[in-house]
């Protein structure tokens, strides 16, 4: 929702979008002090926010099964919390990376930066 806003998702998407921009701004402002700032932009992760009820509602609205909804990306594979954790770990251990936003969404082309 940060780069692909949906109807009535402003209260969710706006802060997420601002936070991704802030990660980049901090990299500019604090990089000369050796401080790195990166972000992870994930999509469709089962969580306390994206509940089974929400997944069912969204799948029904798109006339697809819940499995197909969760695999609705270019890789046709559900993105799991473990995948997102690996992205955070990668950025935390990449000492020469700053100002990056790593997208973990299986290739959701509708949500790619334009």
Where are these regions (language model features)?
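Active-site segment of SDR-like NAD(P)-dependent oxidoreductases
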Residues: 1-4, 108
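Cytosolic ligand/metal-binding cores
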Residues: 10
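Active-site helix of classical SDR
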Residues: 15, 23
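Conserved SDR Rossmann-fold cofactor-binding beta-strand/turn motif
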Residues: 36-46, 103-105
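Catalytic Tyr-x(3-8)-Lys segment
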Residues: 59-82
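C-terminal substrate-recognition "lid" of short-chain dehydrogenase/reductases
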Residues: 78-104, 109
């Amino acid at each position: 929702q940060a780069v692909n806003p949906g109807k009535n998702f402003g209260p969710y998407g706006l802060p997420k979008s601002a936070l991704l921009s802030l990660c980049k701004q901090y990299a500019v402002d604090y990089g000369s002090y050796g401080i790195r700032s990166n972000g992870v932009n994930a999509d469709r992760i089962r969580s306390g926010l994206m509940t089974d009820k929400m997944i069912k509602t969204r799948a029904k609205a798109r006339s697809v099964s819940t499995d197909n909804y969760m695999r609705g990306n270019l890789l046709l594979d559900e993105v799991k919390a473990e995948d997102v954790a690996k992205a955070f770990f990668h950025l935390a251990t990449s000492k020469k990376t700053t100002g990056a936003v790593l997208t973990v969404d299986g290739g959701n082309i509708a949500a790619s930066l334009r």
